[in-house]
Structure formats: structure tokens, C-alpha cells
Regions:
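Conserved N-terminal beta-strand and adjoining loop/helix that marks the start
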Residues: 1-17, 37, 86
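Conserved beta-strand and immediately adjacent loop positions that scaffold enzyme active sites
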Residues: 5, 30, 103
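Short, small-residue-rich loop/turn micro-motifs
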Residues: 20-24
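A conserved beta-turn-beta hairpin within the catalytic core of GNAT-like acetyltransferases
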Residues: 25-29
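Conserved acetyl-CoA binding element of GNAT-fold acetyltransferases
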Residues: 30-36
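Unchanged
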Residues: 36-64, 69-123, 157-161
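Charged phosphate-binding loop/patch that engages nucleotide di/tri-phosphates or the phosphate backbone
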Residues: 121-162
Length: 162
């Protein structure tokens, strides 16, 4: 089985949007990334776009600034593979959630809701993920001409407390 997921982060607030999985889904009532299983020969990005459209009610993430692959997990027997992405958008938005979600929340980075889906927990608490997030933020900052931007500056403080 192949699956994809994404953590969506608002540039304006520096918060991440998490999905509370429905009681009818596997890993029910756990917080996790947005995404799901790929269909047939669907590619990772194609599947992620479809899943986000289904789960968020939008044709993609509104006002996306950047997207980056952050991690690929494959089981030893290679029967399961999950590809994780980080999506940076301009601002928080309200999704129109579907039956796979019981809710959503925007949270400060490093202050993840509980209980976390085990796969999301492994990703979100990993140094590799934090490094990718830092790199994306730094890249966006260096491209900006507006020196007034403090986008996500609190992340270093939040990360230090994790």
C-alpha cells in the first residue's frame, strides 16, 4: 500500500493545521496529517492533490507558497510506503472537512494535539522534519524584500521547548 500526507503551515501565524481522524477511520480519533492512500497507479503528488481536495474541500491548499518533500517511510517488507510533505500557505483557512475527519485545529509548532497518530508523531518529533521546516522558512525569508516580516520567528522558541 502507498500513501501520502501533508502538514500545512500558515506563514502569517506560524501555526500548523492538523486533522482529527474520524471514528470510522483507522487510527480513529487521533490527530495526524492530511492525506491518505493512493489509488491504483496514482503518483504521490497527484494523490496528495486529490486527497487534499477531498479532505479540505478545496482544489489544493489555498494560497500555497511552497511545498517540500520531508520524509518517506517504507516498512522493511516494502508493503507500505508513506510520503510526507510540508506545505506553506499564506494564512490560516477554514476547511470543509469530509467524513474522514472528526475535526481540525491550527496549533503552534511543537505543541501537537494528543493523541497523535503514530506515523505523524514519528515525523513531527524528528530532527529531520524540524530541519526541513527551518530550511523552508529560511528560504522564504531570504526571498522576501520586506524586512518587517517576522514570519514564524517564534518557531525557534517553540522548538527549544520540545
Amino acid at each position: 500500500m502507498r500513501a501520502v500526507g501533508a502538514l500545512i503551515v500558515s506563514k502569517k501565524t506560524g501555526r500548523a493545521m492538523m486533522q482529527l481522524r474520524s471514528s470510522t477511520e483507522s487510527h480513529s480519533m487521533c490527530w495526524g496529517l492530511w492525506g491518505g492512500k493512493l489509488d491504483g497507479n496514482e503518483g504521490d503528488l497527484e494523490g496528495l492533490k486529490r486527497e487534499l481536495c477531498e479532505e479540505l474541500g478545496y482544489p489544493g491548499v489555498p494560497n500555497t507558497i511552497a511545498m517540500s518533500h520531508v520524509y518517506t517511510f517504507t516498512t522493511r517488507d516494502k508493503r507500505f510506503r508513506h510520503v510526507s510533505y510540508l506545505i506553506l500557505c499564506e494564512d490560516e483557512f477554514v476547511p470543509t472537512i469530509d467524513h474522514e475527519s472528526a475535526g481540525y485545529c491550527w496549533v503552534n509548532l511543537g505543541f501537537w494535539p494528543k493523541p497523535l497518530h503514530q506515523g505523524a508523531k514519528s515525523l513531527l518529533l524528528s530532527k529531520s522534519f524540524r530541519n526541513k521546516l527551518d530550511a523552508m522558512i529560511t528560504h522564504i525569508r531570504t526571498k522576501e524584500d520586506d524586512s518587517r516580516s517576522n514570519t514564524l520567528s517564534f518557531y525557534q522558541a517553540a522548538r527549544a521547548s520540545v
